[in-house]
């Protein structure tokens, strides 16, 4: 069960945060791409309640090797295995937005460091899903997740200076089903292009980056929101 929350104080909220804290009322049975990537189901594990038996059965626990964003890895573990997941729109918590000087506040504006931490999160998810062969069965979904978590923001915020992030991604994907041509041919063209660029450690040109971002935004959010994001990116807005 995953519920909603309010940013606290309310004026500290921003578009992305307000959206992800506002799930709709819906239930999913079994594995669902929509639950993982289309709904406002992530991040923030404190708004998700799980049965103890479920967690014990699948040996799901927090990965203590991750110092930043461990809730992303935990939620990918539970949503990837859950037989039934319900999202409710009720806003049951007030979430204090990052305090000045906190880890989350520090990371928010250190783009490369934050994205390298996101690569560590992705590596943990990949290892966890490998336990039950979920990485083989859903390699194309994990490629989408890589773009969502790392690659889109790498080209949006770092542009042609994303080499260190791409190098870290290439290392994580070495030998993985996610980086295989068999998986990438099943992906949307924008997803496959971003993953291939990371594997080759070759940042696209500025024009190609803008085109990739727009195509990916259409894929994940629809044409109208993609146009809004494109305008926001051109204006240099970070929180879109």
Go through the PLM ranges and name each one:
Residues 72, 138-145:
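Alpha-helical scaffolds flanking conserved acidic
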Residues 143-153:
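Amphipathic alpha-helical repeat scaffolds of TPR domains
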């Amino acid at each position: 069960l995953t519920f909603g929350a309010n940013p606290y104080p309310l004026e500290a909220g921003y578009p992305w945060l307000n959206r992800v804290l506002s799930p709709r009322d819906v239930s999913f049975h079994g594995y669902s791409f929509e639950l993982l990537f289309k709904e406002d189901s992530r991040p923030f594990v404190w708004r998700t309640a799980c049965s103890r038996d479920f967690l014990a059965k699948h040996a799901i626990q927090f990965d203590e090797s991750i110092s930043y964003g461990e809730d992303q890895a935990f939620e990918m573990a539970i949503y990837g295995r859950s037989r039934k997941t319900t999202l409710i729109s009720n806003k049951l918590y007030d979430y204090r937005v990052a305090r000045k000087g906190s880890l989350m506040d520090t990371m928010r504006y250190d783009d490369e460091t934050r994205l390298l931490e996101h690569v560590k999160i992705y590596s943990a998810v990949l290892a966890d899903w490998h336990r039950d062969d979920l990485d083989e069965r859903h390699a194309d979904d994990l490629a989408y997740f890589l773009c969502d978590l790392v690659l889109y923001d790498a080209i949006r915020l770092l542009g042609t200076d994303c080499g260190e992030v791409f190098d870290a991604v290439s290392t994580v994907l070495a030998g993985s089903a996610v980086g295989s041509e068999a998986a990438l041919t099943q992906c949307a063209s924008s997803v496959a292009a971003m993953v291939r660029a990371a594997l080759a450690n070759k940042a696209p040109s500025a024009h190609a980056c803008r085109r990739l971002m727009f195509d990916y935004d259409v894929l994940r959010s629809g044409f109208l929101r993609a146009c809004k994001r494109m305008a926001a990116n051109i204006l240099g807005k970070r929180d879109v």
